[in-house]
Amino acid sequence: KSSAADTPRMDREGFTAAPIAAAGKLLVGQSKGDAGTRGWIAALDIETGEEVWRQYTVPAPGEFGNETWADDHGAWKTGGGSLWTTGSYDAEQRLTIWGTAQPVPMFDPEFRPGDNLFTNSAMAWDIDTGALKYYFQYTPNESWDYDENGVHMLIDAPFNGVDRKT
């Protein structure tokens, strides 16, 4: 008997979203979370191809958000959170914003109790450092395969009489 965790990681990763070229970097998102791996985004140097930073959408122990994977068997290791669709880039704020998919296994929320951050979320990362700037989780402990796969439209909109970036 084997599990997704026993299969080499590279055999379980893939890409469906087009990359974003911005600020001298190529932003790519891993999108094969249904195969039992954690989603991630990476920035590659356009000239050298070297990885500048990588951030996972499902946090490991000790990282912010891992406490929302409230199990005793390491469900975060195969947690999902893929980036199915190309994100957005805000050049002025130097942010890239992407939507993440459901947690895995998707139809077994009891295997992965808790909110399962940062699955089914909008996530914004600093393009230079990869630091998470903000997030919003649409459906905690999502088990219906909703995903957050829409492209985030970035606009200036009035709020209480003041234009705000939204």
Regions found by a protein language model. Give the residues of each.
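Extracytoplasmic/lumenal domain signature
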Residues: 1-10, 40-77, 110-148, 153-163
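Repeat-blade elements of multi-bladed beta-propeller folds
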Residues: 11-35, 75-105, 109-111, 121, ...
